[in-house]
Amino acid sequence: MKGKKYYSDYHVWIEPIHSRIVKLGLSSQMREHLGNILHIDLPSLGAFIKEGEKLCILESSKSAIEVLSPVSGEVLEVNTALEDDILPVNNATESEGWFVVLQLTEDFRSESFSLEP
């Protein structure tokens, strides 16, 4: 499971790190649809994010959207480098452009997600 990426209906990729720890980011397919990302508003360290609720806000050349979380958990790590340099979201969406690392409320269930965006 570690190293694989899974994709949600919310256009967010999920990379399991441990059974209850995952890294989240925007699918490259959605990034292409949005156009050039200009700004991101990320959650705070320690915040609790619920499945289906706001994970972050992205402002692009086309629109501003709320990105919804595909899972529930506490924010363990935030990619704060994106606040100073948004380029990784545009150029390395599914690697250096990750948003947060979450500690899930329950074990990650890969069968709920797709292996393709």
From Swiss-Prot:
Domain of life: Bacteria
Keywords from the UniProt entry: Lipoyl
Keyword Coiled coil: no
Pfam family, one: GCV_H
Domain Lipoyl-binding: residue ranges: 21-103
Family: Belongs to the GcvH family.
Protein name: Glycine cleavage system H-like protein
Organism taxonomic ancestry: Bacteria, Pseudomonadati, Chlamydiota, Chlamydiia, Chlamydiales
Originating gene: gcsH
